[in-house]
Structure formats: C-alpha cells, structure tokens
Regions:
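Flexible "arm" and connector segments at domain edges
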Residues: 1-90
C-alpha cells in the first residue's frame, strides 16, 4: 500500500477508535447519571459508521458484505456454544 492510502487508513483507524470512545462516554453518562443521550448517540453512531464505511470501501468491501460475514461469525460462535452446553448436560 502506498504512503497516502496508508496515512488515510491510519487516520480512519484512529478516527473510528475516537468515535467509539465518544459512544462509550455517552452510554456511561446515560447509565451513571441518567443523561438523555438519544440525539447525541445518533450523531456519534453516524460518525462511527462513516469511518467504518470508509475503511470497508478502502478494502473493497460493501457494508452488506461486512454484515454478512459478521452474522456468519456470530452464528458459528452461537452453534459452538450450544454444542458445548448440550455436551455438558448430556
């Protein structure tokens, strides 16, 4: 990867981390202080989605592909968990 795309990728990675931190802060204040966060949370989640979309696009993925792969991973994890539970109770 060339220097310019690498620099942009780094900025996007740091950006998504920062925005995820903003989401965490809002949720903390909501749980701890009862703060109403609905509108602010919508905006911060949009920022996370913005960076996620840019990273996915840089690697040639669509958001549908990302979600599909994630659903498959979660389903496989759930199936393994169920199999372990069934084995433990057999």
């Amino acid at each position: 990867m060339e220097a310019a795309p690498l620099r942009e990728l780094f900025i996007m990675a740091v950006g998504i981390g920062g925005e995820a931190g903003e989401v965490q802060e809002l949720l903390k204040k909501h749980v701890r202080d009862g703060l109403e966060i609905h509108d602010d949370l919508l905006l911060e989640l949009g920022d996370v989605l913005h960076y996620l979309t840019r990273i996915a696009t840089q690697f040639g993925f669509t958001l549908d592909q990302v979600m599909g792969a994630n659903c498959e991973k979660i389903e496989a994890r759930h199936a393994k968990r169920v199999a372990r539970m069934e084995k433990a109770h057999a």
